[in-house]
Amino acid sequence: MNSFSTLKTLFCGSLLALSLVNTTQAGVSLDRTRIVLTGNENSASVNLKNTSPDIPFLAQSWVENENGQKISSPLVALPPLQRLDGAQKGVVRITKTAEVGLLPQDRESLFYLNVREIPPAPKQANVLQMAMQSRIKLFYRPSAIVPEKPGMVWQDQLVFKKQGNKFIVNNPTPYYITIISLSNKLNGEDSDKLTTFPGLMVAPKASLDIPVKTSNVNQFYMMYVNDYGGHPELKFVCQQDSCKVAPKDQQPKY
C-alpha cells in the first residue's frame, strides 16, 4: 500500500471514529440521579428523553437488588421496553409488588434502576454500535420512616471517630447516606479535601471506615447527596477523637 492510500485509509477511519463518538453522545437520558419510593406511594416515575432529534431508540428498563441481581419483585420497572422516536419523551414507572411487605419496615432498602438504550440497526456494514446504559439508585422507604416534612435533614446525625489516618463514621439513622467528600473548607477545592474518593454510601444503622489524608483536624465540611440529587454541605466540629455536627448558627446558609 502506498503512502497516499495509507493516509486515505487513516483519514477515513478517523472520520468513522468521530461519527461513532458523535452518535453515542445522543441517546436516552434520565431526569434524575436517584429515586425514592415510599410506603405511602403506589409507584414512582422517572422521565426519559431521546436526546437525538431524528434517531429512534428502544429503552429497556429493569430493577436490580443491592447485589446487582436482576429482579421482578418486590419492585418492578414498567414498561420493560419502549420505543422513543427522535426527541420523544417517555416514562418508566417503578411499581411495588405484593412482596414489598417482606422488606424491613424500620429502615430503607437499596435497589438500582437500569435503563439501557438500544440503537437501530446500522445502515452501513461493519459499523460498531454501543448500547449505553444508565444505572441509578432506587431507595424503598417504608411508611414508618417517611419524614414529616419534605427536605428534612438527617445527615446531621452522623458521628465521626478519628482513628489513625481514617474516620469511622456511624450512621444511626434508618436512611442510606451518600457522602461526596470531606473538606477543610466550604466548597473546597481538591487541595482542601480530606478524602480522595468520588463518593461512598453508609448503610442504615451501620458504620464504615473512611480513609483520609489526615484526621488531625478540628473541623471539616461534609458534602452529601440529598433526596433531590443536590449536594449541600454540613459543618462538623471535633472534640478530641469525636466529630459531630456543628450548631445550626455555624452551618452554611442555603
UniProtKB/Swiss-Prot annotation:
GO terms for cellular component: outer membrane-bounded periplasmic space. Pfam families: PapD_C, PapD_N. Keywords: Chaperone, Fimbrium biogenesis, Immunoglobulin domain, Periplasm, Signal. It comes from the Bacteria. It is found in: Periplasm. Residues 1-26 form the signal peptide. Its main location: periplasm. One of its GO terms (biological process) is cell wall organization. The keyword Signal applies. Belongs to the periplasmic pilus chaperone family. Involved in the biogenesis of the PMF fimbria. This is Chaperone protein PmfD. The lineage of its organism: Bacteria, Pseudomonadati, Pseudomonadota, Gammaproteobacteria, Enterobacterales.
